[in-house]
Each structure stands twice: as structure tokens, then as C-alpha cells.
Design a protein with these regions (language model features):
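Extended hydrophobic secondary-structure segments that form protein cores and membrane-embedded regions
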Residues: 55-57, 131-136, 212
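Conserved AMP-binding/adenylate-forming
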Residues: 145-217
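Conserved S/T- and glycine-rich ATP-binding loop of Class I adenylate-forming
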Residues: 15-18, 54, 104, 168
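A general structural motif
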Residues: 49-51, 127-130, 160
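AMP-binding/adenylate-forming
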Residues: 28-44, 53-113
Length: 217
């Protein structure tokens, strides 16, 4: 539902539509500030500082909320940002060579494509400037917080690259991000309340699977 006048709406986005028709969401200026703050917290959780340069390997348009959020959060932290967008491995590697970014924001399966391109073109990716990637959209770890098949495949090829997993959704406009312990995403308690509920809307026991239920603050 929308609880402000249309003149208060600054940004229109939609969900990805993975499980059905995309759902439209709208944001006010204050919502965008909150979004920026969430990503600021996510970047600091991964250890990023204003000394880092972020290569943004996701779209910032196409009704995608998170691309703009990453840029705004990095700006709030004071990082340099290179808005390369998604795809085009040749452009990604040219950017890494030219600007020497230290951190990437990327869908992890695209890292496989970057590795394949580098190997075909004799690029020593383990010696490049990229130290870490914050990964979105796909799981990197299993329930025991060990790297899954995708995460392990990347790590085996590119062991010098730290992989940080995230969990987020358009609906909650917040994210859970790993720290350097790589043992699960951190809740941002000033932004959301999270519950894990059963079919009767009751909290599940410790270790049981439940519906992730978010209340935004």
C-alpha cells in the first residue's frame, strides 16, 4: 500500500518477478535515505572503508532497487565507485586494469564468466587489485555456512578473492551481510525486526525452518 501522496514519491522500482508478476514498490526521499544507510552498514560489515574503490557490476536501472542502493551506500561511506553495470567481461577487466578497484558488487555466477574470460585472455586474476566481492542474488553457502558448489568453484579458481554472502529483498529494503567470520548475515536491528514463523504465525524453535517475516522500522 502507499501511504503518501504521489508528489512525495521519488523512485519507482519492481521486484524481479522470479516467482510471478513483478510487484511495484515506491520510495520517498526518506525511504532512499534509509536504503542508503542500510547499504552503508552492509559495506562496513564487510570491512570496506573510504580507502576502497567499488566496482559495481550490477545494473543501476531496469527498475532494480539494489543497484541504486549500492551506489548511494558506497557514496555515504565515502568509497570511490565505478558504475560498470552487469555483463561484458572485457569491459569489467579493462576497468580493473585501469582503475584498480579493491571491491566488487556482483552476482557470483558472473564471477565464473570473469574467470573464464581471464583464462582465455591470459589475465592473472589472482594478482589483480580486487580483494573482495560482495555477492548478491545467489547463495554462496550451505546451511552449515560452508561454501556451496558455486562458492567453492569460485574459491578454487580465485583463492585470493574474499567472497561475502548477502540476503536481501525489495520488500524489506534491507539486507543481511556477512562479516569476515563468514558465518551468516548480520541483522540491522535499527532497520528491521525479523521473525521465523510457522504456518500458524508462531515462532519456530531454534534450528527449525520457518517463514522469514520482516517488520520494517
Amino acid at each position: 500500500f502507499i501511504c503518501v501522496g504521489k508528489e512525495e514519491i521519488i523512485d519507482y522500482v519492481t521486484t524481479s518477478g522470479t516467482l510471478g508478476d513483478p510487484v511495484t514498490f515506491v520510495l520517498t526521499s526518506e525511504d532512499l535515505d534509509r536504503l542508503s544507510y542500510n547499504e552503508f552498514l552492509s559495506f562496513t560489515t564487510t570491512g570496506c572503508t573510504r580507502q576502497d574503490i567499488l566496482q559495481l557490476m550490477t545494473t543501476i536501472d531496469r527498475r532494480f532497487m539494489a543497484g541504486l542502493a549500492y551506489y548511494m551506500g558506497a557514496r555515504e561511506l565515502g568509497m570511490g565507485v565505478i558504475r560498470v553495470g552487469n555483463g561484458i567481461p572485457e569491459l569489467q577487466w579493462d576497468t580493473i586494469r585501469r582503475i584498480q578497484p579493491t571491491c566488487g558488487m556482483v552476482v557470483p555466477s558472473f564471477l565464473i564468466k570473469l574467470i573464464e574470460f581471464a583464462e582465455k585472455n591470459h589475465i592473472d586474476y589472482n594478482a589483480c587489485s580486487m580483494q573482495k566481492c560482495i555477492c548478491i542474488g545467489e547463495a554462496l553457502r550451505n546451511q552449515e555456512f560452508q561454501l556451496n558448489t558455486l562458492g567453492q568453484k569460485i574459491h578454487d579458481k580465485w583463492p585470493a578473492l574474499q567472497l561475502y554472502s548477502t540476503y536481501a529483498s525489495t520488500e524489506m529494503q534491507s539486507s543481511f551481510t556477512e562479516c569476515s567470520e563468514f558465518h551468516g548475515g548480520h541483522l540491522q536491528p535499527e532497520l528491521i525486526i525479523v521473525e521465523f514463523l510457522d504456518d500458524n504465525n508462531q515462532p519456530v524453535a531454534e534450528g527449525e525452518a520457518g517463514e522469514v517475516t520482516i517488520t520494517t522500522l
